Amino acid sequence: MLRGAFFALLALLFWLQAGVVRAQTSQLFSPGVSSATAVPIMPPSAMPTQPMMMVPAGKVALELGARFAKDAPPITSGLTWRVYAAKQDKSGAFNLIKEDTSPSPTMLLPPGKYIVHVGFGLANAVKPITLGSQTLREVFDLPAGGLRLEGRVGDVRIPNSQISFDVYRGSQFETADRRPIAEKVLTGDVVVVPEGTYNIVSNYGTANSVVRSDIRVQAGKLTDITVTHRAAVITLKLVGEKGGEALANTAWSVLTPGGDVIKESIGAFPHVVLAEGEYRAIARNEGRVYERDFKVVTGVDGDVEVLAR
């Protein structure tokens, strides 16, 4: 019997993880909690209790709760509970019986075997349970923490529209599966993940300003990550004379000194975010080619004019 429950649990875990996981953000802690602030600890006796509920004949009460670790306080928001049948149907799926987003719900179910799944951001836990004739209380341990991300150039915060973050499980030096678990995370969003090591990839603009960093997430803590980019916003212009009007219908290529193409665009004055360094701008207009070498300094936004002569 235990062997059957074990394999059913494995099958449900595989079935739940087969779908596409998208980033979910949640306010994990109250405002003001920093990465260095531990969540206060309370004994299990302090876990909130449910008010008395009338249980109809043929039903049993299942009381649920979750916490970050043993003896930690209960999680009070952001949870999604699902109760499934313990056996798969003919199609191989586990039938969903009940779903609840309360932090500590009480579900009324007929006696029998079930599988309970709780999700909190990208963290989750699952247990097989058996309901008899008496109320059953189950507390799930979810060793999860939060990531809150932002990007800066010097002391200036990068606008949300110009930066995004991807989160990968494990270190950047590992060679395992490199699919992101959260994509295009915005500044200030809180991403809830299981505790562990993660690789953060920050993209400022769409060219070559990319910063990678490994961080450690601890259960019950919010980790604020500030990614500093050494880059600047450059506006390209093809002009007939210095300070003149930019010529329309110009095709642009930005190259490294070694000739690698960093960015291509078309327009009179395209904006491009470039990492600090030296570059060559090539402008093509009406069948003619013009070029100029230039240098990017961190935080110094400005125009790069290429003379059409």
Predicted regions and their residues:
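Short Pro-Gly-centered beta-turn/loop motif in secreted/extracellular proteins
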Residues: D100-I115, F120-L122, K184-N199, Y204-A207, ...
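Structured interaction patches on ligand/partner-binding surfaces of diverse proteins
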Residues: Q24-P48, D100-T101, F120-P143, G205-T228, ...
